[in-house]
C-alpha cells in the first residue's frame, strides 16, 4: 500500500459542537457513536451514559478514558506513532476515530478521513472538531476561536496531525489516545 494514492473519507459523520468548554470528549464521542449507531446523538447523552456529570465537569481525565470507552463500547488503541498505512488501515476498517490531541491543552477531535498521493508530504487528515476553529485551507487550518457554537471541519497535513497527536502523550496518565467503533 505504501506509495500509492488513496482517499478514505467517512462523509456521514455528523459534526457536533461541544456544549461547554470542557466537553470536547463527549461531543467527539457523540460523533463516533452516532456514526456507528446511525443516529444523531446529543453530547449530554454521552455524559449521562458515562457516569455522574459532576465527575466530568472539568473534562475527561486521561485516567477515566478506559471506563468511558467501555461504557460506550468503543475499542481502545494504545498510544503509538502511526505510519500512513497504519492510520489508513485503522480508519478504513474501524470507521471514524476519536482522538486525544494537544492543541496545546488536551482536546478530543474526530478523524473522518485521510487522503494522499502516496507520499508523507502530500498526506492529509480530515478532522471534525467540536470546538470552533478557522478552517483555513488544507494543511493551513487557522486559529482556534473563543467559541464552541458550531464545531469545525478542517484538514491538517499528516505532520501537523502527528505533532498534535504525539504531543498529547507527554501529558500525565495519557495511556489511550484513540477510540473507535468496530465498524458498523
Regions found by a protein language model. Give the residues of each.
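Peptidoglycan cell-wall recognition and remodeling modules
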Residues: 14, 48-57, 97-99, 103-104, ...
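Active-site-adjacent substructure of cysteine-protease-like catalytic cores
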Residues: 77-132
Amino acid at each position: 500500500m505504501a506509495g500509492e494514492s488513496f482517499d478514505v473519507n467517512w462523509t456521514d459523520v455528523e459534526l457536533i459542537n461541544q456544549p461547554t468548554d470542557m466537553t470536547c470528549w463527549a461531543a467527539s464521542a457523540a460523533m463516533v457513536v452516532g456514526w456507528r449507531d446511525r443516529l444523531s446523538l446529543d453530547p449530554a447523552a454521552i455524559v449521562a451514559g458515562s457516569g455522574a456529570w459532576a465527575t466530568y465537569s472539568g473534562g475527561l481525565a486521561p485516567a477515566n478514558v478506559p471506563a468511558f470507552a467501555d461504557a460506550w463500547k468503543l475499542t481502545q488503541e494504545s498510544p503509538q506513532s502511526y505510519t500512513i498505512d497504519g492510520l489508513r488501515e485503522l480508519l478504513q476498517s474501524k470507521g471514524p476515530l476519536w482522538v486525544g490531541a494537544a492543541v496545546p491543552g488536551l482536546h478530543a477531535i474526530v478523524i473522518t478521513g485521510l487522503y494522499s498521493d502516496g507520499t508523507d508530504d502530500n498526506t492529509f487528515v480530515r478532522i471534525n472538531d467540536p470546538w470552533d476553529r478557522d478552517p483555513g485551507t488544507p494543511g493551513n487550518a487557522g486559529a482556534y476561536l473563543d467559541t464552541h457554537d458550531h464545531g469545525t471541519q478542517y484538514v491538517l497535513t499528516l505532520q501537523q496531525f502527528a505533532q498534535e497527536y504525539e504531543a498529547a502523550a507527554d501529558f500525565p496518565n495519557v495511556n489511550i489516545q484513540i477510540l473507535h467503533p468496530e465498524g458498523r
